[in-house]
A protein has these predicted regions:
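Short, structured beta-strand-loop surface elements
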Residues: 47-97, 101-114
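Residue-level signal for well-ordered, solvent-exposed loop/turn and beta-edge residues enriched
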Residues: 16-18, 75
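Short, surface-exposed beta-strand-loop junctions and turns on beta-sheet-rich folds
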Residues: 42-44, 63, 125-127
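C-terminal edge-of-domain segments
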Residues: 101-152
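Short His-Asn-centered micro-motif
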Residues: 37-39, 59
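A short, well-structured catalytic beta-strand-centered motif of the EAL phosphodiesterase domain
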Residues: 24-28
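A short, Trp-centered hydrophobic/proline-enriched beta-strand micro-motif
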Residues: 1-16, 54-58
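Short active-site oxyanion
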Residues: 31-35
Length: 152
C-alpha cells in the first residue's frame, strides 16, 4: 500500500466530535502496521493523542476508471522517535522539510496498529472490492444487498 498510496487523507475528530482532515504521508509499513509522522505542536498530534483513532483514504490512478482506493480505520499509538531516523532515511525528501536536528526534534512517529479497511479497484472488471482487517481486529464486511444476483 505504501508504494501505491504514499500521500493519504487522514481524518480525526476535534473536541466537538467534528471531523478534521489533513494530508499525511505514509512513511513505512510492517507486520505491526502503517507508520507516519507528525510534529508534536500540531493540532493533528493533539487529536491523535486524545482520540487514539483515525480514518484514512488513499487513491491512486490517472482517472476515475483506473483508480484504486484504500480506506483504513483504526487505532493509533505513538512510537516516539525510536524509528524516526530509519523513516527519514527511507523518505529522504523529509530532510528538505525538516533540514536541522532542531526541526526534526519536533517530529514523532505514530503507527496504525489495529483496524479494518476496504480495497476498491475500479480498474478491474468486474470491479474489485474487498474488506480486510489487521492487528487482531475482527473483520467488518462492507457492501450491501441489492438483489440475489447483485451485491455491492
Amino acid at each position: 500500500m505504501k508504494s501505491a498510496l504514499h500521500t493519504v487523507i487522514m481524518a480525526t475528530n476535534d473536541d466537538n466530535g467534528n471531523p478534521v482532515t489533513c494530508a499525511v504521508d505514509i512513511m513505512d509499513y510492517d507486520e505491526n502496521g502503517l507508520y507516519f509522522l507528525t510534529a508534536k505542536g500540531k493540532n493533528f498530534y493533539s487529536r491523535l493523542k486524545k482520540n487514539g483513532y483515525l480514518s484514512l483514504t488513499g487513491i491512486n490512478g490517472e482517472d476515475t476508471m483506473s483508480r484504486v482506493a484504500v480506506t483504513v480505520c483504526g487505532k493509533v499509538k505513538e512510537v516516539g522517535s525510536e524509528c524516526l531516523k530509519r523513516l527519514l532515511d527511507k523518505n529522504s525528501y523529509m530532510y528538505e522539510i525538516y533540514p536541522t536536528e532542531c526541526s526534526r526534534s519536533a517530529l514523532t512517529v505514530f503507527y496504525i496498529y489495529k483496524g479494518n479497511g476496504e480495497w476498491f479497484d475500479l480498474s478491474k472488471k468486474p470491479i474489485e472490492r474487498y474488506s480486510f482487517s489487521f492487528g487482531s481486529e475482527d473483520l467488518k464486511e462492507v457492501g450491501y444487498f441489492i438483489t440475489d444476483k447483485c451485491n455491492a
